[in-house]
Amino acid sequence: GATTANSGYPRSELREMTAGGSQNASWSNTAGSHSMTIRQAITHVPDVKPHVVAGQIHDGSDDVVMIRLEGTRLFVEGSSNDLGELDPNYALGTPFTVQVIAQDGHIYVNYNGVPKVTYARAGSGFYFKAGCYTQSNPSRGDAPGAYGEVIVYGLHVSHT
């Protein structure tokens, strides 16, 4: 799959845009409320390093929070730290809904309607990403044809 400038891992993601898709979105969680709700299922992971990211808040330089699957453990990661578990025994192909809310200098993550993570992290230049960011490649021991797959059934982004 395709990689981007700052990563050696392949991805197929939607990036939040504005102005009918002609401008990159960029907002601060210290003003207003910003929400992304995704109904999705992770359906495939690489064999050797079975890691996939299925949703993110990103800023101008790096990820802020990621919805991440490692093996069967679905959790939230932020600044390379484990922020909280969503499902310790996620089964591939199981649909779930994750809501990421950024407001008042915090990021909140709900999983299937249940609050799971509160993360104190204020910032700007934020934007949402949804899709599949596979966290492996041949240098990690996976075959060149290894892949991750995420099916997005529904996606809603709002700003108030």
Give each language-model segment a name.
Residues 75-97:
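Short, aromatic/His-centered strand-loop micro-motif at the edge of beta-sheets
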Residues 72-75, 107-108:
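Hydrophobic residues embedded in beta-strands of well-ordered beta-sheets
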Residues 31-35, 47-49, 55, 120-160:
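Ligand-recognition surfaces built from glycine- and aromatic
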Residues 110-114:
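Short strand-turn-strand beta-turns centered on an Asx-Gly dipeptide
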Residues 1-73:
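Secretory/extracellular carbohydrate-interaction modules
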Residues 38, 94-103, 107-109:
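Short tryptophan-centered beta-strand motifs in secreted/extracellular beta-sheet-rich domains
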Residues 2-10, 60-66, 81-86, 135-145:
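Short, surface-exposed beta-strand/loop "edge" segments at domain boundaries and coil↔beta transitions
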